[in-house]
């Protein structure tokens, strides 16, 4: 026993050490020497009004064919977060003004594409030293500026029904001096301008103290023909530590997140109080009364939840294989989500490589196939299933099959639209290889042990002949009750879900993993408690077919998640599995308290 404890302590110490080293590596040496080149990279074009991103090369600025694509991870490929090097030249701590980037010849097709991007408010995502650019907004009347993060840099604007293009970018790079001629980049902001240059020479200001006069220049209209692109590079000293350079991105809209948490806690509190009152008052009174009357050999003519003790754990009448596979897949996704969020909460996820969270999530999904296979096979055997191989194959194909079919349809649309988010066949093939050689074998192993392990313990014997189910009130039919429970569950999570999806669609950074973790926990509690209430009241009217009902109640928020079918599929499986376990534990508890003849 001591040896096992010491080995466990060594493994735990090793993991903690690795986590601390991973965290400390972020704040070690990322310094640059004076005069060294800083790469200014550009990512996808994204918009709040449209969901299809485009590649930076679609802008056809200068010779876009010469732009080199940065090294991509699997997460960046799947999310369409592909970055390219640009021809903007920046050297550390060397200010330059009115640099000529190139002369660009716009065709009619280019002009129409730019107009579409401007009308739909597309932004360019640019980075320096892995820091996303903040947008500098300048008010020419008040002579004041403000910085807005997360959106990116606009391509142009519309004024008096005329399209203008931002053809002059002013890069503001914040430096923190580390040593003599050695600096860290701690900030990156861009002030876009529109300047109508001459035919061959730029008209932008070349002196630092006169830069704001560029706003008094005539703007550059979007038109066919020759357009000159220029830029400035300005360095500013800052006392922001390198370890705190991401703070500007983290603190945005935190108060709104707390509002969402408060709403979730309020709904959880109401549901919890209602469930506690029900359990402590009604159930205890019913159990004591029932046990007393049984001990006195009195006739029990009433028909409520106690009278269906011999049927309440009866296996589902239809689709046992499907339900067991869905519960197992839900547990697999829940385990993956828990492990990934835990690493994000403790700060293990590096914001400089923010797409690694998807890479880690994919790996956790593969390894959590052990849990999914175990749970699905255990339930399938409990319900009388006779083949662990069948349930393991079904579990391994259920979620990936739906996702792949949906993703292929979306990918075809993205390819037709020439979107940056389109994924090559070779990348999809790599995911298939990962599934066939990792996920599927682990689900098989988990199913084998789940099928051979002890069955779920129940406090009541199941009657050989099913009891008659009487009529119940219309409002207890799950066709109607799911809309109400789904609305309550959706209200618990929708604020946080809105920010997560906004960051996903606009290729932004989502830092607030703690808020997300709390919201998901509260969401799980609400759906579990609601499913208990619905199942209890159905049992009171003699309806013991609760397995599928509990799953559907937990999955009911999907009604309000709209067209996001793949994400909704994950919500269905996770919430449905949670509801089944909540109801199973609840029924085990209350039926173990009564005496069964």
What is the role of each PLM region?
Residues 20-262:
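Soluble extramembrane domains flanking the early transmembrane region of eukaryotic membrane proteins
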Residues 333-367, 373-394, 404-432, 493-516, ...:
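Membrane-lumen (extracellular) interface motif
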């Amino acid at each position: 026993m001591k040896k096992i404890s010491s080995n466990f302590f060594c493994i735990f110490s090793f993991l903690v050490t690795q986590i601390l080293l991973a965290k400390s590596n972020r704040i070690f040496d990322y310094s640059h020497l004076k005069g060294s080149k800083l790469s200014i990279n550009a990512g996808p074009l994204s918009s709040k009004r449209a969901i299809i991103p485009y590649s930076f090369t679609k802008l056809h600025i200068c010779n876009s064919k010469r732009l080199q694509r940065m090294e991509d991870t699997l997460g960046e490929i799947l999310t369409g977060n592909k970055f390219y090097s640009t021809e903007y030249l920046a050297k550390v701590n060397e200010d330059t003004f009115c640099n000529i980037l190139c002369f660009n010849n716009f065709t009619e097709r280019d002009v129409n594409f730019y107009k579409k991007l401007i009308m739909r408010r597309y932004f360019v995502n640019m980075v320096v030293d892995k820091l996303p650019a903040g947008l500098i907004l300048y008010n020419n009347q008040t002579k004041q500026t403000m910085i807005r993060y997360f959106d990116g840099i606009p391509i142009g604007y519309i004024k008096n029904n005329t399209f203008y293009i931002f053809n002059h970018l002013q890069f503001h790079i914040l430096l923190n001096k580390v040593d003599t001629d050695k600096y860290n980049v701690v900030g990156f902001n861009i002030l876009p301008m529109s300047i109508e240059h001459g035919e061959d020479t730029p008209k932008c200001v070349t002196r630092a103290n006169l830069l704001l006069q560029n706003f008094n220049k005539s703007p550059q209209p979007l038109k066919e023909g020759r357009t000159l692109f220029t830029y400035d590079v300005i360095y500013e000293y800052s006392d922001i530590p390198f370890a705190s350079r991401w703070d500007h991105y983290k603190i945005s809209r935190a108060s709104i997140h707390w509002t969402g948490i408060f709403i979730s806690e309020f709904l959880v509190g109401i549901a919890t109080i209602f469930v506690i009152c029900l359990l402590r008052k009604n159930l205890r009174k019913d159990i004591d009364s029932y046990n007393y009357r049984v001990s006195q050999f009195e006739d029990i003519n009433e028909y409520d939840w106690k009278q269906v003790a011999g049927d309440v754990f009866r296996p589902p009448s239809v689709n046992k294989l499907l339900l067991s596979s869905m519960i197992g897949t839900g547990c697999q996704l829940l385990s993956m989500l828990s492990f990934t969020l835990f690493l994000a909460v403790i700060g293990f996820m590096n914001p400089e490589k923010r797409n690694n969270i998807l890479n880690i999530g994919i790996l956790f999904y593969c390894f959590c196939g052990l849990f999914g296979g175990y749970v699905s096979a255990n339930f399938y055997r409990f319900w009388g299933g006779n083949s662990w191989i069948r349930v393991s194959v079904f579990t391994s194909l259920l979620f990936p099959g739906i996702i792949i079919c949906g993703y292929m349809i979306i990918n075809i649309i993205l390819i037709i639209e020439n979107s940056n988010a389109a994924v090559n066949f070779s990348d999809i093939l790599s995911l298939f290889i990962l599934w066939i050689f990792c996920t599927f074998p682990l689900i098989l192993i988990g199913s084998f042990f789940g099928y051979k392990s002890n069955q779920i313990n129940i406090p009541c014997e199941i009657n050989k002949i099913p009891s008659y189910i009487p009529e119940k009130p219309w409002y207890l039919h799950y066709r109607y009750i799911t809309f109400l429970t789904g609305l309550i569950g959706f209200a618990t999570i929708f604020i946080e879900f809105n920010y997560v999806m906004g960051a996903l669609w606009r290729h932004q950074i989502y830092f607030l993993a703690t808020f997300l973790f709390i919201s998901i926990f509260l969401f799980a509690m609400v759906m579990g408690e609601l499913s208990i209430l619905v199942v209890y009241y159905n049992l009171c009217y003699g309806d013991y077919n609760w397995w599928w009902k509990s799953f559907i109640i937990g999955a009911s928020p999907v009604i309000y998640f709209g067209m996001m079918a793949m994400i909704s599929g994950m919500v269905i499986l996770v919430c449905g599995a949670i509801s089944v376990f909540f109801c199973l534990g609840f029924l085990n508890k209350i039926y173990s308290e009564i005496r069964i003849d």
